[in-house]
Amino acid sequence: MNIQTIMSSFTAQDKDQEVRPSSSGSWACKEVDEFDALSIEYKPKPTEKYPAKLHARNVRKYLDVGEGLIYLPGLPSFNYEDSDMPPAFRQRRYFYYITGVNLSDCIVTYNIHRDQLWLWIPPPNSGRSVIYNGARPTIKEIMSKYDFDHVETLTHLDSYLTWYAHTEPGKIHVLHDYQAPKNIELQITRKNGCHSIISESPFDSSKLEEAMNTARAIKSPYELRMIRKASAITAQGHLNVLRGLRHLSNEAEIEAIFTATCIAKQAKTQAYGVIAGSGENASTLHYMANNEPLKGRQLLCLDAGCEWDCYASDVTRTVPISGEYTEEAEAIYDIVAKMQDECIELLKPGANYRDIHIHAHKVALKGLMDLGLVEGGTFDELFMAGVSVAFFPHGLGHYVGLEVHDVGPGGSRITNRLYGFDKKPADWTDAYFQILSNTGVTSDGGSILEKDMVVTVEPGIYFSRYALEEVYLKSPNYAKYINKDLLQKYYPVGGVRIEDDLLITEDGYENLTTVLKGKEALKIINEGKEQEEEEEREANRKATESRKQKKTWFW
């Protein structure tokens, strides 16, 4: 069976097989009248628009100012260097959050005091531009489709900003200084009656990013529907890979099946590059070459998720390529599955994600000790020495939303600072502190979970030759605890990672990921295996009989 045959069979199979929930968690929160994850059909209300105004008001709440103007430019159009061809368009996510507009060369302003959201668009195009690229949407079309108080062309924006800076109260809030327009007065003189008082810049870049990060961390009902849609299509892509896996010969075919499934479902953009690492390639966390043969390798680590209307999904599954685990691979998979199951059960509002990450390390260490991969001390000694980080070197998870590694409350998207700590507590060893400082997955604002956040839980155990032999085994602090001889048996495992997207609900969590895993995934991989083996035996029997007949005829 070749890849073309596998792909052609998926359409028929999609109609016959549901994408089933993969682990605990209620479906009760899903608005099934508007979105049915099993059919992967999103059914918007007739008058539904992207909730741009709601999102703008959320930002206003966290900006905590009574007046001012939010100014956000969308992505401008541009071509590759030394080329007349543009890259694939990817809208600036902060702009998209308060607009829902996926068009280039637009700007949005939000008057905080007046509660007015305005979109500024390029003038209508004509001539060759329309012939080649189609007509840009008109003001009337945009007003009917999007949630704005007013839409105006960019030709009037400079005048509007100058008017605002001289007559309206409050600063013009921008994300970054370089995004402030350069063609209006940067220094203005405010007047009090007839007297000039102070000369100052109208722009302020100190508050908006933090406010928008905090707003974006809590998903609106519309955003959750988009993430569900992306998750459902992602599930179908993973399912199709499982169906064909035993008949594939190269990592490239795995990537092709996944992306083709997403595109066929109208999800034409991946939230990140597909990671289809087989064998020892699975030990490279962000392996994306996807070009090596599968033959003779134990596991496939497939980390892949599509976008739907700019909202991401992020799912990882690790499965045996042959449909059967080796003893070593199954042992590692069971540890990682236990890490994930226990950590997911700890999710709820008020839970500290940092503590859940620490729990994952404890489960990993216990499993590695049971296998004899780490030894030479008590559990507490090995834990405080940070030995588990040699095998589990990344954070447990991250926010998911408009970015696959989405922003969180307070600070920037990814930080190297430890959540909730400005410095290492005095009684922590450097190695133990490293376990925690690797949790750079939420923001400086802390790691406390809140209702309507979406986070991943993605524990993993890896046998990276480079990490182990060039880093940890060269450090006496780690090497004395690692069983170097036993490592040789586990290098071919490569790595195991399991990742789901979880919605924090009022009293716990809901697993948004419906991709099969564990024994259910093995059933899909091995579907038809017995029949194929019987057909192969029958073909061999007939070939043997044919050879015998020819031999008899010859004599």
UniProtKB/Swiss-Prot annotation:
User: Quick one: a GO biological-process term for this protein?
Assistant: proteolysis
- In this chain, Mn(2+) 1 is annotated as bound at D314, E458, E499
Q: Which Pfam families match?
A: AMP_N, Peptidase_M24
| Descriptive protein name | Probable Xaa-Pro aminopeptidase BC1G_13431
Chain positions covered by the region annotation Disordered: 527-555
Q: Where is the composition biased (Basic and acidic residues)?
A: 538-547
Q: Which organism is it from?
A: Botryotinia fuckeliana (strain B05.10) (Noble rot fungus)
The note on cofactor binding and number reads:
Binds 2 manganese ions per subunit.
Q: What does this protein do?
A: Catalyzes the removal of a penultimate prolyl residue from the N-termini of peptides.
Give the required cofactors. Answer: Mn(2+)
| Catalysis performed (reactions) | Release of any N-terminal amino acid, including proline, that is linked to proline, even from a dipeptide or tripeptide
Q: Which family does it belong to?
A: Belongs to the peptidase M24B family.
EC assignment: the record states 3.4.11.9
Q: Which GO terms describe its molecular function?
A: manganese ion binding; metalloaminopeptidase activity
- Give the domain of life: Eukaryota
Q: Where does Mn(2+) 2 bind?
A: D303, D314, E499
UniProt keywords, alphabetically: Aminopeptidase, Hydrolase, Manganese, Metal-binding, Metalloprotease, Protease
The main enzyme category here is hydrolase
